[in-house]
Amino acid sequence: MIYTLYIIATLGVTIFYTLLTQLYIRSRKKHNRLRSQYLRQVSAAVLADSDSLAIAITASSRRERLALADAIYTTASHCYDHNHSITALIAQENNLEKHLLRELRFATKYRQGLLWLQLATISPSHHYTLQLRQELHNSDPHIRSCSLIALLCTSPEESIKTLLELDFELQPYDISRIISLVRRGVLPFAFERLLQSGNYNLKLLAISIVRHFNLDIYTKYIYSLLGNKEHPKLITEVIYTLTTMKHPLNSPLLRRHILAMPPSQRKALCRHLSAEGYSLQALRWLLPNNEMEYAERLITSHKRQLSQSNRAQV
């Protein structure tokens, strides 16, 4: 009897969660259909820079508003120096700011981060700046990261002050998001100020920007950081930046820092150097003899050729 009840209960729970999964999948499909529809409309309005097309975009239900907010965020994330007044007009006509703020109260942690990003993109306002600054101290790294990007979007003129006041170290994901804002023209950084700052986060961001945009004129300054008593992570970023920019490897200072790395980090750097096209002879100068066999296998493997051919296509 007990065994039969156990089987029935198990089947009931299985059926319940199966139904929940099916409902969620159906809901996501509807959301994606609406989002695709709004993406076409928002993109057309932004490209045409047309107020009339923007006003024609309507969202009356909760599902439609969420899909429209997602579409505006996606469009803005892929546009460079676009006219924000068009997306702001769409948001205003559909009262998106009010509805997104209401969604924030009941959202899960992951969803909260996405809603902050959408809110900052759709309607960058100083009304919720204080709340965003409070979220920077959240223990959840996802919410913290999303809140930082949202705050930079809403108050770009205070971006350096915001980064200076952070009580956590920027992670690679944060850096890539900030660089995306720089590329899109959202953040008006005074770049020299970043490089000359004694703040870890600002200097890390500056080094990453040099690498990302291949700013050759700052190579000498970046190399000079190897001679300073910098944070170990900054030294690693400097090495990756110099090698990405094809800096010669025949430097005693560079070799000393690479030999001081833990073997696991040196192995990762070896993969990076191989992908960047450095020769086996150049690596012999940098790596210990017992690690040269691994470097030789990397350089002569087909993976290196695939990596370089993919970069050439991009």
Walk through the language-model features, giving the residues of each.
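Structural detector for internal amphipathic alpha-helices that build alpha-solenoid repeat scaffolds
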Residues: 74-75, 81-91, 113-124, 144-154, ...
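Generic structural signal of hydrophobic/aromatic residues within well-ordered alpha-helices
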Residues: 42-43, 53-56, 68, 72, ...
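Long, low-complexity regulatory tails in eukaryotic proteins
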Residues: 293-294, 306-309, 314
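Short glycine/proline-enriched turn or capping motifs at secondary-structure junctions
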Residues: 288-296
